[in-house]
Design a protein with these regions (language model features):
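N-terminal pre-catalytic segment of deacetylase/amide-hydrolase enzymes
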Residues: 2-95, 127, 258-284
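Active-site beta->alpha N-cap acidic-glycine motif
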Residues: 43-140, 144-155, 169-182
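His/Asp/Glu-enriched short active-site or ligand-binding loop at hydrolase and phosphoryl-transfer sites
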Residues: 193, 197-234, 268-279
Length: 284
């Protein structure tokens, strides 16, 4: 499942198969990019905001929103199923989490779901439902959930050039599942990337989405500890990473049901990543 990292320079300690660090990349510009992403799953009446490419056309990276434009926070959930986990799903292991999605709907929390193409193939009805619900937005988490750097804490790897095709394959899987409005946002598997990755993916026109708050829900069994980590970490403009899989993140629904009312009590408003990017560009 997905490795986690607080920041690109943070020290990661979440286990061999579930921890990751991206190397330092360019700070994303706050000016909107004028070019339509070539990997958008389908045309949209309203083009989602993206960041302008970095120096030399490098893929821009977004970590968090503005700290000075009100108490807004974006919850993100990685629906990550690795390409070789089909037999486990066939034997009854659950890589989805309908209870979590139901909780988000009941609590009226907008959220961004970073989905692998393999997950969309396994759960096409859920993928289509998420894509058709305006409360949510779906973005790309690759097809296979293989890392695009040589070492990413135990994930299988592929080079960046093959990784670019893997991301395009995910958009194809989304369309086949009936999900036709996936955004031109990409979360690297494990959060791992380097300069070579950013160069290779620049041709896709995507904005890479990282985070500044690690929930710690991956493989966690103590919902209270995860809740505390989220509440202690959130600041205005935060992007929180969590997971949408019963298999590897069984406490997440309970965490959400506790954290959401507490953050609202503290004055926070929940937004999607696209709204957070828009806020960083001066649009609300």
């Amino acid at each position: 499942m997905i490795p986690l990292v607080r920041r690109m320079t943070a020290i990661c300690a979440l286990g061999a198969a579930l921890a990751a660090c991206g190397t330092a990349g360019p700070a994303g510009s706050t000016r909107p990019a004028p070019v339509k992403s070539p990997v958008s799953a389908s045309p949209s009446a309203t083009r989602p905001p993206v960041l302008t490419p970095g120096p030399g056309g490098l893929t821009p990276v977004f970590e968090h929103g503005p700290r000075d434009k009100g108490k807004i926070v974006a919850f993100t959930f990685d629906a990550d199923m690795t390409a070789d986990e089909g037999p486990r799903a066939a034997s009854g292991e659950h890589f989805d989490n309908p209870g979590l999605i139901g909780a988000l709907r009941a609590l009226k929390v907008p959220a961004t779901i970073f989905m692998t193409g393999r997950w969309a193939e396994e759960y096409p009805d859920e993928a289509r439902s998420l894509g058709g619900d305006p409360q949510f937005e779906v973005a790309n988490h690759s097809y296979s959930h293989y890392a695009f750097t040589p070492s990413c804490y135990g994930l299988p790897t592929m080079d960046a050039e093959h990784g670019r095709a893997d991301v395009e394959r995910a958009y194809t899987a989304f369309r086949k599942a009936g999900l036709r409005n996936a955004l031109p946002y990409l979360r690297f598997p494990g959060g791992c990337y380097d300069q070579q990755t950013l160069r290779a993916f620049s041709k896709l026109g995507v904005t890479a989405i990282q985070w500044d708050v690690v929930s710690g829900d991956a493989f966690a069994t103590d919902a209270d500890a995860v809740t505390k980590q989220v509440l202690d970490g959130v600041r205005p403009g935060s992007v929180v990473i969590m997971h949408c899989t019963r298999s590897a993140a069984p406490t997440t629904e309970r965490v959400v049901r506790t954290v959401v009312p507490e953050l609202r009590k503290r004055g926070y408003t929940f937004v999607k990543v696209s709204q957070m990017i828009a806020a960083s560009q001066g649009h609300r």
